[in-house]
């Protein structure tokens, strides 16, 4: 895959079905060993994302979705925007690259898109404590655990510990 054949652009609602078709398998793969497949079946689906999750996320002021595409097909996506509690920080809600397109710099290019969209804002995100692949990616990009913790409870009795990461572009506290 040649980097020159990859285009990064803002997604439009018409793109959502193709984005979800790419996003869903890599999302499931990212949760392998963290949540059982039957639980994933209960909490996410491409149809749900196209009809509800993507539109609701993007209704938040300042939020956007960007996609990486090759040959007119999405091979990566990211969603980000101002954090509700701290609008001076930009939260990355999602960054996924199709499995066969990983390790070609696409995730880094999508992350750079978010960084350039808000050049002076600190970037924050949540990462499942057990998601070592994602944690490694962000740590290589100079994100650091920032002391925040969160337990995601997608279903009754299902608890998924998360840690907060932050890329400091202002002076870190302390």
From Swiss-Prot:
Protein name per its UniProtKB record: Probable N-acetyltransferase Rv2775
Domain of life: Bacteria
CDD domains in the cross-refs: NAT_SF
GO function term, MF aspect, one: acyltransferase activity, transferring groups other than amino-acyl groups
Organism in which the protein naturally occurs: Mycobacterium tuberculosis (strain ATCC 25618 / H37Rv)
Record-linked InterPro entries: Acyl_CoA_acyltransferase, Bact_Acetyltransf, GNAT_dom
Family under the similarity heading: Belongs to the acetyltransferase family.
KW Lyase (keyword) present: no
């Amino acid at each position: 895959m040649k980097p020159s054949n990859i285009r990064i652009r803002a997604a439009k609602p018409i793109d959502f079905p193709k984005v979800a078709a790419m996003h869903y398998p890599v999302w499931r793969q990212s949760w392998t060993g963290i949540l059982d497949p039957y639980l994933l079946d209960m909490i996410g689906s491409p149809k749900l994302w196209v009809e509800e999750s993507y539109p609701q996320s993007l209704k938040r002021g300042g939020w956007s979705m960007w996609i990486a595409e090759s040959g007119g097909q999405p091979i990566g996506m990211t969603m980000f925007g101002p954090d509700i509690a701290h609008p001076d920080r930009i939260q990355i809600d999602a960054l996924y690259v199709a499995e066969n397109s990983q390790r070609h710099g696409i995730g880094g290019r999508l992350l750079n898109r978010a960084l350039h969209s808000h050049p002076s804002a600190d970037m924050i995100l949540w990462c499942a404590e057990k998601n070592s692949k994602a944690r490694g990616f962000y740590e290589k990009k100079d994100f650091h655990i920032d002391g925040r913790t969160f337990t995601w409870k997608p279903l009754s009795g299902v608890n998924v510990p998360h840690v907060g990461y932050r890329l400091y572009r202002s002076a870190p506290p302390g």
